[in-house]
Amino acid sequence: MSTLQSLIIDGFHGNGFHMIEEYLQQKESHVPQKYNHLLLHHLDRLIKEELDKNEFQNCSLLLKCIQRFFRDDPDHEEPLLIQQGLIPKMVSWFEIITGLLITKVLASEALLTNALEDFLDTALIISRHSRKATVQMLDSFILRLGFLVAEDSVKPSIQQETLATLNCILNAAPQEERRKLSSAEGACCLMKELARTILTVGDYSQQVALSEALCRMSVGRQRNDLAMQWFENTALAEAFKKIKNREFETDCRQFLNFLNNRLGNQRRVYSFPCLAAFADGQEMRKPADEKLEEFWIDFNLGSQSVTFYIDNAESALWEPVKLLKEAMVKFIIIENDRIKMFIVYLKQPIVISKREAKKIEIHFDRQLGILQASIQALGEDKQAPSFQTSVLVKLFSGLEKEDGEIPGRCEREAEDAEESTLLPELVDAEADRCLITRCFNVQTVPGVSKGSLEITNTEERSLENSKQDEPEQVTSEYDYPLDMQEPSIQNQASDLNNIKEDSAFARDREQDRRMPFNDRNHDLLESNEDSSLSTNERSWTQNHKRKSLRTYSQRKKQRVSSLRILPLSPIRSGHAPEKDEAELVPLWKGISRRNDSTLLKISETKLRGSSVLLTSGASTQKIGLEKPERRGSEPSSSTKKTRVTDGLHWREPRSPHPSSGPSSLEYLEVEENIPEIVNRESFMGNSSFKHKLENLGHREIPDGSVAALKQSRLEDAPGSPVVTDTSTPSQEDMPGSVNGSAFKTAFENFTRDLKRKFELELKQREIPFSLEKAKEAPACLIRLWNQIHTCRLDTLERFHSSVLRELSGLEKNLQTLKCLEKDALASLLFVLSLGRERTFSR
């Protein structure tokens, strides 16, 4: 078998790179590679030649070869490549790549970006395997990495990767070498540039990484002296000096909130504390940290994204969630007199806590100005138009309060739940979505978390001694922007007023910091120092005002629900989840919350497997449904399942009639101006629909259940769109012989009579709304009654369409055969005439 060096030499002599690519696809052997002093010479010549020819893919292959040399020989003290001068060669390669990045023609080249990523990966691997190489990187390579981060013309994604590599190399460097670095002239200029970039970068995660780089480059008491040089504003410098290594993540949150607020209208990041956040109905929990009081959501103007961190049940690292503008279909903001709901619809599902989600819903206090921040970060083009928002307001303002019973819950928990009125949300079939929110009375001072930088005890002691007289927490001037106000953008969704004011949050354990960027782990350790809170801090857990609701510590222990996890999207780092279970902590038990969310229709949508084009102008007819008031208990329903099919999120079709409270059914008349989304034929095979039928069989269904008849689309709603598998031919398209035939007339009469028979059978079972029995009709039965009737009419309509289509085809085929018959007869006569002419000629 050829060695890797021999393959590189073959590529040097012009034999191509395909053999190298095949070699790299093999599994790592971890057997030391054999190479000599000529390897570095060949690598240097090849990489520079490929960069000059803009063959960035070949350059990536050569960089991966260097990675293989170090990975296959992890125990070697100082590899030969380092002794021969690999780091200076890499500096020259990096200068060429960064020069190409600044060039506008090649800046968007994907292969060039991949080559830079491979270069950064190579530098990271070398720093992990060679102490000498890490020290050499501090002299020159670190400075070039830092100035690339500060370059405004570089894309944010490249800046973020470069910054992550910079921090990892600094983390691997010895403390004494970092102390020397901070006193060098070039490093001082770099640190001032990094501090300036914090003000303009426009992305919270990059602001954190820049602050981390400054903390790593300044050791001990040097940080206090240098901070006054980095920031012209004395208040900012004093705030930065309050960042402690062992409480870096939460102290940095306080500092950045203070910094962004002081920038006023020039700020590039807006941070707001949210009340609750959901991904396709599943609660996303705040990271479990004693000092992190608020669940922060960041609107980033620079990267045009919304980012936040959530609790990771299977890791000490926080899980990052990033919603990019280009990944969104639309976003809407719905406001009532208590909260604001920020809802994002995504083009493709993203993986959050090992589950795919296409809709992200975040609740804020109504005092916060999230409208202005969201428009500045995402653009007005991503905000849903007013007519679509008004439709979604009706759907998200309490349509799901009809169903409140979850099978299998004990009666005591159900009685406790009846006294509380919660925001209606979706309940998965296999996992209750737990509503874990914070109190409405938002704090002015954000909390801090347990993230820490990896430092020695000597360095930490020196930092603490230098700050003996300083308060441990940033004062109350670290406010999130409460002054940003905007008027209500939609009708008030009154049903949202019943959201729970106080709730509890479980602190499972202390955690480190955010997720690593690719395989660039920042090696942040948990802190063992005193975690006592200052006087201006409060515990996340609140006492409930309603005595029927217990605190979180008094509730049942956590349960792990086995979930059917959808396939995960590929990630660059290659780290895949190891378990197929997601940890769910149900806080509100015995309560079913449903969210009949209709997928947002922005433009014409063609459903797979359907021959009908759905447009935003489609509308169904106006129907009314009178629901007498029900006393005593909440309506019952079964849990609902959701599944992703062909990229669309299918849900069980529901009646569009909302309920204004958890224990009453009132008369409502809803204007259905929503496009048809689900093919009527599909919901009969839906597992959720079958689950509902099974659950109904175990309940007592009172006689005389009422459902308002939905008129047939064949006669009463000719202008409404009908989602069927085939389109009905119009009378003008039908041949005249078929239209006037006795069969056609008889078939039309048959269809009409059968339709009327269906409606008559339903009317015979109808109970007047004024009867007492009608008040006992479950909401699910009323809805199911309407769906059965509609399905019956749709089935008849499809049959009607198919017969007419077959009649049309039959007429055309007969006409074609008739023409062929005439042609055959004419040909026969012509042949016979030719035969007679030959006979006479003889």
Swiss-Prot record:
Protein location: Nucleus; Chromosome, Centromere
Any one of the GO CC terms: female germ cell nucleus
Keywords recorded for this protein, A-Z: Centromere, Chromosome, Nucleus
Disulfide bonds: none
InterPro entries: SYCP2-like, SYCP2_ARLD, SYCP2_SLD
Biological processes per GO annotation: negative regulation of programmed cell death
Composition bias type Basic and acidic residues, residue spans: 458-470, 505-525, 624-633, 643-655
Phenotype upon gene inactivation: Reduced fertility in females: acceleration of the age-associated decline of fertility in female mice, due to progressive loss of oocytes. Males are normal and fertile.
Tissues where the protein occurs: Specifically expressed in oocytes.
Source superkingdom: Eukaryota
Pfam families listed in its UniProt record: SYCP2_ARLD (PF18581), SYCP2_SLD (PF18584)
Region (Disordered): 451-473, 505-560, 619-666, 715-738
Biased composition (Basic residues): 543-559
Primary residence: nucleus
Protein function: Oocyte-specific protein that localizes to centromeres at the dictyate stage and regulates the survival of primordial oocytes.
Family per similarity comment: Belongs to the SYCP2 family.
Protein name (database record): Synaptonemal complex protein 2-like
